[in-house]
Amino acid sequence: MTVGIIMGSKSDWPTMKHAAEMLDQFGVAYETKVVSAHRTPHLLADYASSAKERGLQVIIAGAGGAAHLPGMTAAFTSLPVLGVPVQSRALSGLDSLYSIVQMPKGIAVGTLAIGEAGAANAGLLAAQIIGIHNPEVMSKVEAFRAKQTQSVLDNPNPAEE
């Protein structure tokens, strides 16, 4: 596995599956796991501290509410951690965004947008990071970007179907 996709609870999967789907497009291997910062802190510590030795290169961590998972993951590993705020009913994910983005100096978490777009972009960003040293993955990322560009160029008039 190259990327770890972790989430605070199973209910976060409808959001986090978009990271997995993006990684599938680029042929990047990943694992998925529920790892709660609050309910299973020892599991989190074990998961994050062993990630590099297990072959992971990037960890995508999605969480809602207090959203301590990405920051605590980053505290236990030197790997890049990408945080995805999961949208909640109470505050629409803003609480999660603030929890993830406001990390203290010295413990970095790359924070993405709230919800589905953030999860998909976390998958894309993970592929870009891996692509730095993997030409095959980078080629697929570049083809993805070119396809997006061509789609806009092929449909410049919003009034046409």
Swiss-Prot record:
Q: Which residues bind substrate?
A: S9, D12, R39
For this protein, the Enzyme Commission number is 5.4.99.18
The keyword Translocase is assigned to this record:
no
Q: Which cysteines are joined by disulfide bonds?
A: none
A Pfam family it matches:
AIRC
The entry's function note states:
Catalyzes the conversion of N5-carboxyaminoimidazole ribonucleotide (N5-CAIR) to 4-carboxy-5-aminoimidazole ribonucleotide (CAIR).
In its UniProt entry, what is this protein called? N5-carboxyaminoimidazole ribonucleotide mutase
**Organism from which the protein derives:** Vibrio cholerae serotype O1 (strain ATCC 39315 / El Tor Inaba N16961)
Q: What is the lineage of its organism?
A: Bacteria, Pseudomonadati, Pseudomonadota, Gammaproteobacteria, Vibrionales
